[in-house]
Swiss-Prot record:
InterPro entries listed in its UniProt record: CAXX_Prtase_1 (IPR027057), Peptidase_M48 (IPR001915), Peptidase_M48_N (IPR032456)
Protein name: CAAX prenyl protease 1 homolog
Catalytic residue list: 285, 366
Subcellular location: Endoplasmic reticulum membrane
Protein task: Proteolytically removes the C-terminal three residues of farnesylated proteins. The substrate specificity is only partially overlapping with that of FACE2.
Major location (coarse): endoplasmic reticulum
A molecular function GO annotation: metal ion binding
Catalytic activity field: Hydrolyzes the peptide bond -P2-(S-farnesyl or geranylgeranyl)C-P1'-P2'-P3'-COOH where P1' and P2' are amino acids with aliphatic side chains and P3' is any C-terminal residue
EC category name: hydrolase
Cross-referenced Pfam families: Peptidase_M48 (PF01435), Peptidase_M48_N (PF16491)
Length: 424
């Protein structure tokens, strides 16, 4: 008797939807609380709290609708055999274009073109509502409809340019990989990730935002002095025009080896009260570098990728698995898609584990900045970022433990105060 793989996958998807909806309902209850957490009383104004509460509730209601539609669509696609039907139709198109339907690479690219078109059509109403209703209502959206369409066109163009050679390479590797397939797949994706990490900030990100050098002045001098004191190989210091699309703020760093760069959102510079608060945020980011968090995270991702490819090689020739999902043939891409569905339970556990590690890293980076003497500036900087981004002030502990990669503000402030007392 054949194992009902597809029915099991759909069943687990529904179970996870119910579980995550339960967590969402708990978070909704927390968001409806009319008062600030005790730690934030007197720190955040009632006006900002009310705005944050309204924004968080709007996003929460939107999330309920989006997730309900998503689980309906995903379950229907699997349960009613739409995936194999779509694969068959994408192959039938090729002869009309004078192309060989037996060529798996061409068939796969035709399939992906259809999937991408379908995804854009189904995602568009949600993206438009999120950007031009919710984000606009709460003063974040700065995009025009033309900018939105232009970004979508640019994203599609990049997919068309970068997607085919990557897909072709993966199919070729799977077809020729033999017993060392997992190693070859991992090596290819490892090299690809390094290439993308190199070209994204230089070639891709500038297509969507303008990056300009931070002007000479006290702020630049303080950041360079901090970087130098930590022996951080800072080569370039940029300001990105995030305000052209949103008033959300952030800062990040990137680069390999001796070629590191720091990027500040112009909104971060505008929102912080003084330069020392901005430097405190950078001290936190440099803490991630000094404590090797980026390296550890990258290694963890590579290990997980290798394990996934190893698992894929064990099931890629399983006729029963493909037939359970409605396929008589065993295309490479379809095998990868099916495998991703069958390991959904493990993916949820891994995601939860990575969030735990990420939150621990955030506490460590905060403590690093405090030890450098930035406690009095980091604290108000985090509060300001929370206020200006209208992030949720009240959070359910189970919800945040499961979903959040960063600790809630209340926990971070409490930890900063505790670390600051140790250094006194």
């Amino acid at each position: 008797m054949a194992i009902p793989f597809m029915e099991t996958v759909v069943g687990f998807m529904i179970v996870m939807y119910i579980f995550e909806t339960y967590l969402d309902l708990r978070q909704l209850t927390a968001l409806k609380l009319p008062t600030l957490p005790k730690t934030l009383v007197g720190v955040i104004s009632q006006e900002k709290f009310e705005k944050s509460r309204a924004y968080s509730l709007d996003k929460s209601y939107f999330h309920f609708v989006h997730e309900f539609v998503t689980i309906l669509m995903d379950s229907a696609i699997l349960f009613f055999g739409i995936l194999p039907w779509f694969w068959k139709m994408s192959g039938a198109v090729l002869p009309r274009l004078g192309l060989d339907p037996e060529n798996e690479i061409l068939h796969t690219l035709s399939f992906l073109a259809g999937v991408m078109t379908w995804s854009q059509i189904t995602d568009l109403p949600f993206s438009l509502y999120s950007t031009f209703v919710i984000e606009s209502r709460h003063g974040f959206n700065k995009q025009t409809i033309w900018m939105f369409i232009r970004d979508m066109i640019k994203g599609t163009f990049l997919s068309v340019i970068l997607g085919p050679p990557i897909v072709a390479a993966i199919i070729f590797i799977v077809q020729k990989g033999g017993p060392y397939l997992a190693i070859y797949l991992w090596a290819f994706m490892f090299i690809l990730s390094l290439v993308m990490m190199t070209i994204y900030p230089v070639l891709i990100a500038p297509l969507f935002n303008k990056f300009t050098p931070l002007p000479d002045g006290d702020l630049r001098e303080k950041i360079e002095k901090l970087a130098s004191s930590l022996k951080f190989p800072l080569k370039k210091l940029f300001v990105v025009d995030g305000s052209t699309r949103s008033s959300h703020s952030n800062a990040y760093m990137y680069g390999f080896f001796k070629n590191k760069r720091i990027v500040l959102y112009d909104t971060l510079i505008q929102q912080c009260k003084n330069e020392d608060e901005i430097v405190a945020v950078i001290a936190h980011e440099l803490g991630h570098w000094k404590l090797n968090h980026t390296t550890y995270s990258f290694i963890a991702v590579q290990i997980l990728a290798f394990l996934q490819f190893g698992g894929y090689t064990l099931v890629r020739n399983s006729t029963d698995l493909f037939r359970s999902f409605g396929f008589d043939t065993q295309p490479v891409l379809i095998g990868l898609i099916i495998f991703q569905h069958t390991v959904i339970p493990l993916q949820h556990l891994v995601s939860f584990g990575l969030n735990l590690v990420s939150r621990a890293f955030e506490f460590q980076a905060d403590a690093f900045a405090v030890k450098l003497g930035y406690a009095k500036d980091l604290r108000p900087a985090l509060v300001k970022l929370q206020e200006e981004n209208l992030s949720a002030m009240n959070t359910d502990p189970l919800y945040s433990a499961y979903h959040y990669s960063h600790p809630p503000l209340v926990e971070r402030l409490r930890a900063i105060d505790g670390e600051d007392k140790k250094t006194d």
